[in-house]
Amino acid sequence: MTILIDRHSDQNDAGDEIVEKNQGNGKEEETELVLDAGFEAPHTNSFGRTFRDYDAESERRRGVEEFYRVNHIGQTVDFVRKMREEYEKLNRTEMSIWECCELLNEFIDESDPDLDEPQIEHLLQTAEAIRKDYPDEDWLHLTGLIHDLGKVLLHSSFGELPQWAVVGDTFPVGCAFDESIVHHKYFKENPDYDNPSYNSKYGIYTEGCGLDNVLMSWGHDDYMYLVAKENQTTLPSAGLFIIRYHSFYALHKSEAYKHLMNNEDRENMKWLKVFNKYDLYSKSKVRVNVEEVKPYYLSLTNKYFPSKLKW
């Protein structure tokens, strides 16, 4: 994986090789960071198939496609605004980060074609893989642990939202649905698809408006972003960016919607691309010893969050 960076040196803090690239088109010479850390992405998922292959025949394929059909029909501007208005109140409960992690033991993500393990397994796999390769970036370890905590929206005490309103790839609403979005064909049944206010390239937005001003399809990403922000986390902006956009594959895989990004977004994208490698490819059947790593992650939650958060 290669990401653009601004600084010019021979190595980054993790020892990754930095290679100079001349664009050859009259633009400034840019530097690329070649991620050369210890974690190696496997070729197949826990089912022995290619990662994020939504067409491969598998026991989960039909269920995943049906999930996206319902998701793409239901995620409208009106729905997103309604959900944000409801959940930004943060009046459901108060609990710690770790208590929230434990709640996720009950759930399996129906939109994920790569894994059928409880969510806390994925959180710890992601965090531990990052920790191994980036030992000095403790904020990134914690981001790995908490990035999916918004999936508590599936829990009865949080409204028990249907999976299509909690998980899956995210995308902007209020502008055209890019064709790179998985199972794009189902957007034709979305009420916003033929709405002239929402179906152009920019829709209700302007060029370079910044992703923070863009309504994203509602789900665990946006909810956890709201929780972290409103509870005054001291995570760097890149951490919040990862939390809100880690499921925005149309952007960080297909480079769609870049016309909405501002300079801060472009800076934070560098870390999102680093994170995505671990989020996607660390999924496996190998268990993490929860009790062994728990004290370390409790120390991080105490560093970057209050002991109890409003949810």
UniProtKB/Swiss-Prot annotation:
Domain of life: Eukaryota
Keyword line: Ascorbate biosynthesis, Cytoplasm, Iron, Metal-binding, Oxidoreductase
Catalysis: reaction(s): myo-inositol + O2 = D-glucuronate + H2O + H(+)
Record-listed Fe cation 2 binding positions: 148, 220, 246
Residues engaged in binding substrate: 52, 109-111, 151, 168-169, 246-247
Main location: cytoplasm
Cofactor(s) essential for the protein: Fe cation
Transmembrane segments: none
EC number: 1.13.99.1
Keyword Transmembrane: no
Tissue expression profile of the protein: Expressed in roots, young leaves, stems, flowers and siliques.
Annotated stretches, region: Disordered: 1-29
Binding site for Fe cation 1: 122, 147-148, 279
Gene knockout outcome: Incorporation of the inositol pathway-derived monosaccharides is strongly reduced in knockout AtMIOX1 seedling walls.
Known role: Catalyzes the oxygenative cleavage of myo-inositol to D-glucuronate. Involved in the biosynthesis of UDP-glucuronic acid (UDP-GlcA), providing nucleotide sugars for cell-wall polymers. May be also involved in plant ascorbate biosynthesis.
Protein's UniProt name: Inositol oxygenase 1
Organism per entry: Arabidopsis thaliana
Lineage: Eukaryota, Viridiplantae, Streptophyta, Embryophyta, Tracheophyta
